[in-house]
Amino acid sequence: MAELPIAPVGRIIKNAGAPRVSDDARDALAKVLEEMGEGIAAEAVKLAKHAGRKTVKASDIEMAVKAA
């Protein structure tokens, strides 16, 4: 089960131009976003550790996204 709230995920789809969004579509996008987010976060943690830090910074996230 996805940890992301469903309502904001539905709004993302609506902001992309969909007049209506099914529950299945919201659930599917939430799952994909969560999987992508976990992958990016894991890479950001590696970058922070490599830099000798325990704290993940925004720059780590940005670098992880570019590396993906």
UniProtKB/Swiss-Prot annotation:
Binds and compact DNA (95 to 150 base pairs) to form nucleosome-like structures that contain positive DNA supercoils. Increases the resistance of DNA to thermal denaturation (in vitro). It comes from the Archaea. PANTHER family: ARCHAEAL HISTONE A (PTHR47828:SF1). GO terms for molecular function: DNA binding; protein heterodimerization activity. It is found in: Cytoplasm; Chromosome. The gene is hfoA1. Homodimer or heterodimer with another histone. Dimers then assemble into higher oligomers, with the DNA wrapped around the protein core. It holds the Pfam family CBFD_NFYB_HMF. Keywords: Chromosome, Cytoplasm, DNA-binding. Its main location: cytoplasm. InterPro entries: Archaeal_histone_HMF (IPR050947), CBFA_NFYB_domain (IPR003958), Histone-fold (IPR009072), HmfB-like (IPR050004). GO terms for cellular component: chromosome; cytoplasm. Residues 20-22, 54-57 are annotated as: Interaction with DNA. The record marks 14 as: Interaction with DNA. This is Archaeal histone A1. The keyword S-adenosyl-L-methionine does not apply. Belongs to the archaeal histone HMF family.
